[in-house]
C-alpha cells in the first residue's frame, strides 16, 4: 500500500511516496509564492546505488535503474528547523567548510532507507535556505554489516527524479517528452560558456518502446574529465518545456569529478546527478562494516520559465556563498578567468 508524506519549508514543498513494495520517490514539488505545483507520475527512486556484485535491473549504463535503488525501502524521516539543521550540519561535516547565510537559515529533511538484500543503509538529505527556492540534496550510504563484510560502491546519485508536469496538466506521455529542450554549456580555456539549446527528441528519437514493455537504454550524459572540472563542460544545465510552462535548473556542486545525465523512460523523462563513477572516472569506494560515504551535493529548482529558474539559481548561490564583507559592499571586481594568475 502506497503511503505519502509532505515536507514544507517557507519556500518549497516536497511530496514523497513509498511502500512495502516500492522505493521512496519524489512525487510533488511546489513553490506557492511562484504558483509552481508539479506532480511526478513517473516514480524514480530518490537514490540510485551501483555496487560491485549488484548491477542494473534493466541492462543499461544509466545512473538510474540500479537494483539497489529499486530495493531500498523507507525506514523513517526527520525534519529539522534552522537551528537544529545547523547543529546537524556541524555534526555530520557535510557543511563544515561552509560559513554562509544559508547554513544558519535553512530547513532540513533526512529520509532514511534500507536494503535488506545488501545491508546498505542510506540517508538522503534535503536542505532549503529561506528566500532561495532551490533544493540542495546529498546522500550518505553506510554498510550496516548485517549482510556483507564489504560493500564496494561504483556510483551513487546525489539526486534522481522524473521531469514531471503541472498538477492540473494531462499525464505525461512519450509524445509530451518531445516538447522538452536541454540547454547546456561547452567549455574551453579561451572560450567558456558556449551555451546551446537542443530539443530532446533530437537526442532521443521516438522508438515506440512502450510496445516492448521496457524503458529505453540510452541516455545523454555529461562528464568531467581530469582535475579540470569545467575544462570541457559545465556541471549545470536547464531543462525547459514551453507548452507546460516549466523549467528545471540543476547543478552538481563539486570541483572534482562529476556526471549528470538526462534520458527518456517510457512514462516520462528523467535526470540524475552524481559525483565520480567507476565507469567514467575509475572510481570505487569500499565500505567496511560501519563505514559510510557521503556524495557530493547537488541542487535543483523548478520555475515557470528559464528566466525564473535562473533567478532561483542566483538567489540560491547568494544564500550559500561564503560570508564576507564584500558580499554586502564589493570593493574590487576582477574577472581574470584564471588566465592571469
Labelled PLM ranges:
Residues 4, 292, 331:
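A residue-level signal for beta-strand positions that form part of recognition/binding surfaces
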Residues 2-8, 12-16, 20, 24-264:
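Polysaccharide-binding surfaces and accessory modules of carbohydrate-active proteins
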Residues 260-274:
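Short, basic/aromatic beta-hairpin or loop at an interaction surface
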Amino acid at each position: 500500500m502506497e503511503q505519502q508524506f509532505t515536507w514544507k519549508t517557507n519556500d518549497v514543498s516536497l511530496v514523497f511516496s513509498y511502500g512495502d513494495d516500492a522505493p521512496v520517490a519524489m512525487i510533488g514539488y511546489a513553490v506557492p509564492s511562484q504558483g509552481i505545483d508539479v506532480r511526478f507520475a513517473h516514480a524514480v527512486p530518490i537514490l540510485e546505488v551501483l555496487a560491485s556484485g549488484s548491477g542494473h535491473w534493466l541492462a543499461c549504463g544509466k545512473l538510474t535503474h540500479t537494483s539497489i535503488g529499486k530495493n531500498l525501502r523507507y525506514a523513517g524521516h526527520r525534519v529539522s528547523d534552522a537551528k537544529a539543521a545547523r547543529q546537524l550540519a556541524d555534526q555530520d561535516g557535510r557543511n563544515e567548510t561552509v560559513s554562509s547565510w544559508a547554513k544558519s537559515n535553512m530547513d532540513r529533511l533526512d529520509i532514511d532507507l534500507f536494503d535488506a538484500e545488501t545491508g546498505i543503509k542510506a540517508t538522503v538529505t534535503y536542505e532549503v535556505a529561506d528566500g532561495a527556492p532551490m533544493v540542495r540534496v546529498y546522500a550518505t550510504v553506510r554498510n550496516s554489516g548485517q549482510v556483507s563484510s564489504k560493500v564496494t560502491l561504483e556510483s551513487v546519485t546525489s539526486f534522481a527524479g522524473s521531469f514531471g508536469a503541472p498538477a492540473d496538466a494531462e499525464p505525461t506521455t512519450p509524445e509530451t517528452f518531445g516538447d522538452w529542450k536541454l540547454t547546456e554549456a561547452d567549455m574551453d580555456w579561451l572560450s567558456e560558456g558556449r551555451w546551446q539549446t537542443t530539443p530532446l527528441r533530437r537526442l532521443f528519437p521516438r522508438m515506440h518502446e512502450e510496445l516492448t514493455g521496457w524503458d529505453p537504454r540510452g541516455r545523454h550524459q555529461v562528464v568531467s574529465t581530469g582535475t579540470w572540472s569545467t575544462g570541457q563542460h559545465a556541471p549545470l544545465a536547464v531543462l525547459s518545456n514551453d507548452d507546460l510552462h516549466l523549467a528545471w535548473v540543476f547543478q552538481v556542486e563539486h570541483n572534482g569529478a562529476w556526471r549528470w545525465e538526462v534520458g527518456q523512460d517510457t512514462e516520462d523523462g528523467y535526470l540524475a546527478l552524481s559525483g565520480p563513477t567507476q565507469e567514467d572516472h575509475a572510481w570505487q569506494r569500499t565500505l567496511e562494516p560501519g563505514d559510510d560515504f557521503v556524495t557530493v551535493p547537488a541542487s535543483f529548482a523548478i520555475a515557470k520559465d528559464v528566466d525564473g529558474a535562473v533567478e532561483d539559481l542566483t538567489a540560491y548561490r547568494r544564500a550559500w556563498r561564503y560570508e564576507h564583507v564584500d558580499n554586502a559592499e564589493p570593493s574590487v571586481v576582477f574577472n581574470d578567468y584564471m588566465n592571469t594568475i
